[in-house]
Amino acid sequence: MRVLLILVSLAALAHAESFLKSKTGYQGVQTLPGFIGGSQPHLGGGIGGGRPFISQPNLGGGIGGGIGGGKPFIPQPNLGGGIGSTRPFPRPQYGDYGSRNSCNRQCPSTYGGRGICCRRWGSCCPTNYKG
């Protein structure tokens, strides 16, 4: 499948190049020595005829915004998860109460002995929840 895609791409490129060569005034794209990267001078087709011009680098104006266009930066709302955030039940600890065998075991005294180890392989919940 990839080979077929590459062949189709090469055929389209060859067709486009032959189409451009049939147009009057086509000079082609020439790169000058000493320019490495994406901002090489291009000859022909620029403003004012066939004078060379330096192409501007892409600064991220595509999808997602960035410098030079696109969407402005909009900060996301704080969804928690930072320092001091609270959870409806403690994060599962994969230690003393973290195996399938201990899931029906009573919770330690920090929960007042009310909770049962929940969430299959998780830790103890402060409520009598078993799931």
From Swiss-Prot:
GO terms for biological process: defense response to fungus; defense response to Gram-negative bacterium; defense response to Gram-positive bacterium; killing of cells of another organism. Strongly expressed in hemocytes, with weaker expression in gills and epidermis. Expressed at low levels in hepatopancreas. One of its GO terms (cellular component) is cytoplasm. Disulfide bonds join C103-C117, C107-C124, C118-C125. The keyword Signal applies. It is found in: Cytoplasmic granule. GO terms for molecular function: chitin binding. Its main location: cytoplasm. Transmembrane segments: none annotated. Antimicrobial peptide. Has strong antibacterial activity against the Gram-positive bacterium C.glutamicum (MIC=0.4 uM) and the Gram-negative bacterium E.coli (MIC=12.5 uM). Has weak antibacterial activity against the Gram-positive bacterium S.aureus (MIC>50 uM) and the Gram-negative bacterium P.aeruginosa (MIC>50 uM). Has antifungal activity against S.cerevisiae (MIC=12.5) and C.albicans (MIC=6.3 uM). Has weak antifungal activity against the mold B.cinerea. Presents chitin-binding activity. This is Hyastatin. It comes from Hyas araneus (Atlantic lyre crab).
